[in-house]
Amino acid sequence: MKDCITYDINKCTYDDLSAVGKLYDTVTKYLEEHVNYPKWTHGEYPSLASATIALNDGSLYCVKQGDKIVSAFVLNSDPQGDYSVGDWSKFIPEGEYMVIHSLAVLDECKGKGIGQQVVKFCLDTAKEQGYKGVRVDVVPDNFPARNLYEKMGFTFAGEYDLKRGIEYIPTFQLLEFNF
């Protein structure tokens, strides 16, 4: 893991919300103009609206370099879909594992180890809070995300319809890290 630059990772506050909304806006615009690996939709997801929901339930985090928000993500125990279908190596009831959602990094900050620091933070947080593991789902062609998670020790748990009702993403790949 690149450790020459350290970032501050904390729960977002209402003061951070506007900047997180702008970050998601910038990232989704960039993805739509380039290769949109996660198939995110500008203005829909992730967005200021989804960030507000996560902030209100205490699951929105931001990564800062100085005063600038360079990344944001959600960490909670809600899979937002049917995770029961996964080929999990270990049965863990819903609510006893954490899930990473909406991990976005500004394009100009990619390749600086932010994603690795975020995943390590999520693993450490889940373990400290007594969860039994961390799970995540990615769009099948989201090679950068899958590579990041596998590099950090996650293992593949199958590709399934999570019953989210997203027609243009019929299946998601599931990954797990158990403690």
Label each residue range with its predicted role.
Residues 105, 111-124, 147, 151:
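Conserved acetyl-CoA-binding loop-helix of GNAT-fold acetyltransferases
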Residues 1-18:
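Conserved N-terminal entry element of GNAT/NAT acetyltransferase domains
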Residues 74-102, 110, 163-166:
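Conserved acyl-donor/pantetheine-binding loop and adjacent beta-alpha core of acyl/acetyltransferases
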Residues 94, 139-143, 150-152, 159-179:
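C-terminal "cap" of GNAT-fold acetyltransferases
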Residues 50-62, 78-82, 99:
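A short helix-loop-beta-strand connector motif used in the catalytic cores of GNAT acetyltransferases and
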Residues 119, 126-137:
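Conserved GNAT acetyl-CoA-binding A-motif
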Residues 57-73:
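Conserved beta-hairpin
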Residues 8, 29-50:
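Conserved GNAT-fold acetyl-CoA-binding loop/helix
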